[in-house]
């Protein structure tokens, strides 16, 4: 499992810093204007008595293009080759089809261009609600955490809920809490299996819980204005986070953990063929893996000297420790879980395996 930020204290300090530095606005798109110079696109926001200016981040560029109906490949070409045309296109469509949008900014940068009904489930509040629950769960410990440009992650294992896949090969139950403040996915609580022998984490999609960022529509006004937490919103969020606390407290489920362990054991009996290079190429095409990821998986697949489906799953999750980006590392852990489920289910349908009955 890839290690992110060093300590929970470091994580909390960064979340507090971001809380102070961020600014969220609701703006009529007619009050917005972009201007691109020397490869940098700035967006200005008229608030009535002032004009605020922010540099567009990469995610905001993509969200802006999508909302305005500009094909992203063409958007990027204008951005690189004809920035004046980009500005004309964006400013024209912002004015022609006016609507309210939420602008999320941090450190002078527009990081998200979202619906005005987007519910702000902030990372600091999430951590404040989730960490006390984790601390009260017997044997639970945060073993990896990070805050990236797009997501917050807390990866937790329960040291008391463990079993052997085969003698000497121990796995522990756990879960992952993740959240995006910029519209790149729901707040999720996903089951995790942690293999001690190689420190691999595998995320299962089967029993994941999701909470979506959909909230109330904001008031109607022509001028942009800053969003603050009001008492009604705070009350709504309290109820919401109480539900999240309930999900987290029940995230380590022994019956579901045992079902995943049974699938891991079943995967040991599934052969992947006689050509590991071809096996990894097929895998790479199916899950859109880049050359470095394919090379890493192949290396671990061969070094593990286990060419069963179980060995392939472990090669994928082990490769997550080799990538630089924490988001991508987590996605490879999810791919490992999906690969396990699909391989075992496919073998069972062909009559090659008999799966245990669901709990």
Language-model segments: which ranges?
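Intrinsically disordered, low-complexity regions enriched in serine/threonine
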Residues: 1-88, 144, 148, 159-359
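Sparse, context-dependent recognition of short Cys/His-centered cofactor- or disulfide-binding micro-motifs
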Residues: 49, 111, 115, 139-141, ...
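Generic amphipathic alpha-helical segments used as scaffolds and interaction surfaces in large
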Residues: 51, 55, 113-121
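A short, surface-exposed helix-loop junction/capping segment
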Residues: 94-117
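Amphipathic alpha-helical segments
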Residues: 116-141
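Extracellular structured ligand-interaction cores
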Residues: 151
